[in-house]
């Protein structure tokens, strides 16, 4: 798997169990509803080990910049803060979010390809959401 496969614009086309995931990680009702109604586009750029990911939607735009394998401070769109590390393992991009506050919940976000689709799973505890994107 080449990191270059991820480069481009990706439009959300399928979403399963996303609201349950957001509830599990502690996102409030109004923000959950808004996030579930949004149909985000991902813009991914890669330069060596440095990645730049924009998530664009009518709900909120976010930017995530990171270097593979290097821990960084991350603030989620709803304001939760994590120590995060993103690596490539077995052809998948694995994003581990470790909570800073005891009231937050750790998550693992994994991205890989199934045919032409970019699949993303978001897991916290026993709750797993699956989302699929297609290239624009």
UniProtKB/Swiss-Prot annotation:
A fatty acid binds at residues 111, 131-133. CDD domains: FABP. Belongs to the calycin superfamily. Fatty-acid binding protein (FABP) family. Keywords: Lipid-binding, Transport. The gene is lbp-5. InterPro entries: Calycin, Fatty_acid-bd, ILBP, Lipocln_cytosolic_FA-bd_dom. GO terms for biological process: fatty acid transport. Gene3D superfamilies: 2.40.128.20. One of its GO terms (cellular component) is perinuclear region of cytoplasm. One of its GO terms (molecular function) is fatty acid binding. This is Fatty acid-binding protein homolog 5.
């Amino acid at each position: 798997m080449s990191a270059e496969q991820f480069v481009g614009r990706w439009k959300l086309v399928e979403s399963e169990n996303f609201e349950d995931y957001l509830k599990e990680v502690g996102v409030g009702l109004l923000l959950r509803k808004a996030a579930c109604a949004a149909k985000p586009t991902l813009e991914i750029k890669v330069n060596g080990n440095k990645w730049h990911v924009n998530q664009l939607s009518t709900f909120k735009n976010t930017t995530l910049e990171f270097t593979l394998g290097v821990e960084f401070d991350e603030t989620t769109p709803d304001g939760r803060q994590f120590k995060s590390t993103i690596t490539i393992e077995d052809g998948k991009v694995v994003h581990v979010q470790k909570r800073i506050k005891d009231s937050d919940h750790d998550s693992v976000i994994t991205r890989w390809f199934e045919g032409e689709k970019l699949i993303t799973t978001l897991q916290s505890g026993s709750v797993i959401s699956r989302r699929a994107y297609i290239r624009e």
